[in-house]
């Protein structure tokens, strides 16, 4: 389940839509309904394993990262720092809505952490290792992502703009992950330079949307 927060300026009103039934409660539909009268809609947590469908005059949109409210000209949509940001999926969804004639106002928190390719690999390998006891993961990398977030080894969007910090962090990450890949899963190891180049690609894609969303709100 994931949630949204909606802000309406003239009344200083905040509405929070939060799931309480393990997903599929219709949060996206309700958020989209409220968003028509909102100024800001915030997707504050969750990842691309969740989803919501919006149907309007622009078409049918199956969204996984974009906040509900993207189809309204009056709304600024914010992806908050609690979101597991899969940048490739973010860009793919953005391209799809733009093709339908929608140009959303989007901001991404500079403190949002990035779901990396190795998160998806580790998610997949763990399901393989568990065999018949597998959790039934969507293999979107969500569990490894949040493990890294709480272990304080995740990569924040703002760190893409600090080469020295990014390279030091990647060195630490690769050292830790390669131990797991080699000794637990017996899989190919990660390459620091390859991951750095991936991060530079992410930087180009996401840079226009990054800001201090806390200050904005």
Regions found by a protein language model. Give the residues of each.
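Non-transmembrane, aqueous-exposed alpha-helical and coiled segments at domain scale
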Residues: 12-217
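Short, Lys/Arg-enriched N-terminal segments with co-localized hydrophobic residues
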Residues: 1-12
């Amino acid at each position: 389940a994931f949630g949204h927060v909606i802000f309406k300026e003239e009344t200083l009103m905040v509405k929070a839509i939060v799931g309480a039934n393990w997903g599929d409660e219709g949060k996206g539909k309700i958020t989209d309904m409220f968003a028509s009268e909102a100024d800001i809609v915030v997707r504050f947590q969750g990842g691309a394993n969740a989803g919501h469908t919006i149907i309007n005059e622009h078409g049918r949109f199956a969204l996984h990262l974009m906040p509900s409210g993207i189809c309204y000209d009056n709304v600024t949509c914010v992806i908050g720092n609690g979101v597991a940001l899969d940048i490739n999926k973010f860009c793919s969804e953005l391209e799809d809505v733009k093709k339908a004639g929608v140009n959303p106002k989007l901001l991404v928190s500079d403190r949002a952490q990035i779901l990396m390719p190795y998160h998806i690999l580790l998610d997949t390998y763990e399901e393989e290792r568990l065999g018949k006891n597998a959790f039934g993961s969507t293999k979107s990398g969500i569990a490894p992502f949040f493990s890294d977030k709480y272990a304080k080894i995740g990569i924040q969007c703002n760190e893409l703009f600090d080469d020295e910090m990014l390279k030091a962090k990647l060195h630490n990450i690769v050292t830790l992950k390669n131990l797991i890949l080699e000794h637990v899963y017996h899989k190919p190891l990660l390459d620091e330079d390859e991951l750095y180049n991936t991060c530079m690609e992410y930087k180009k894609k996401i840079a226009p949307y990054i800001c201090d969303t806390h200050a904005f709100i």
